[in-house]
């Protein structure tokens, strides 16, 4: 288990999953990168983790399941899962875009992925947590208030 902000990649195509994982590992230094080509195993892994925070890179279609089903399955443990997700799709149709909007997913990338687009999306989500951590370190009263939640 990592002490950082981990990235969890889920794509039912093992080759694509491996490529995305290697790409993220080439630039990401704030945690570990875990990858799954089986969404059920990914759900089980997420629910067994101690920490309910991660960045998710999820294919919109996961065999017989949807990426949105995956997010709904882990939402109780990961309350910010939807907003901390990058959905990837071979075809970002109007339906996929509307599902992202309805699910509060702000990042949608089309395959083939452009490495810089993925890096910027991961960085944007990471920045939210880095800013929060800085605020906790700088403001003792704020940190105490958060600890009481």
Residues of each region from the PLM?
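Acidic, metal-coordinating helix/loop segments flanking the phosphotransfer/catalytic sites
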Residues: 35-55
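Alpha4 helix (beta4-alpha4-beta5 surface) of REC/receiver domains from two-component response regulators
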Residues: 69, 82, 92-107
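CheY-like receiver
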Residues: 127-149
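Acidic catalytic/metal-coordinating carboxylates
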Residues: 38, 66-69
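C-terminal output helix
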Residues: 113-122
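Two-component/phosphorelay signaling modules centered on CheY-like receiver
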Residues: 14-36
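Short amphipathic alpha-helix used as the core "switch/output" element in two-component signaling
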Residues: 44, 68-81
């Amino acid at each position: 288990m990592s002490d950082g902000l981990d990235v969890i990649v889920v794509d039912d195509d093992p080759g694509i999953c491996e490529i995305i994982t290697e790409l993220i590992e080439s630039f990401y230094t704030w945690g570990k990168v875990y990858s799954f080509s089986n969404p059920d195993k990914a759900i089980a892994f997420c629910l067994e983790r101690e920490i309910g925070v991660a960045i998710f890179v999820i294919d919109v279609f996961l065999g017989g399941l949807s990426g949105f089903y995956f997010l709904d399955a882990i939402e109780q443990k990961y309350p910010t899962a939807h907003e901390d997700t990058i959905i990837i799709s071979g075809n970002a149709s109007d339906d996929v875009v509307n599902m992202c909007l309805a699910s509060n997913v702000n990042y949608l990338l089309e395959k083939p992925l452009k490495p810089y687009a993925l890096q910027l999306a991961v960085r944007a989500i990471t920045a939210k947590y880095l800013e929060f951590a800085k605020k906790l370190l700088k403001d003792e009263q704020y940190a105490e208030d958060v600890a009481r939640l």
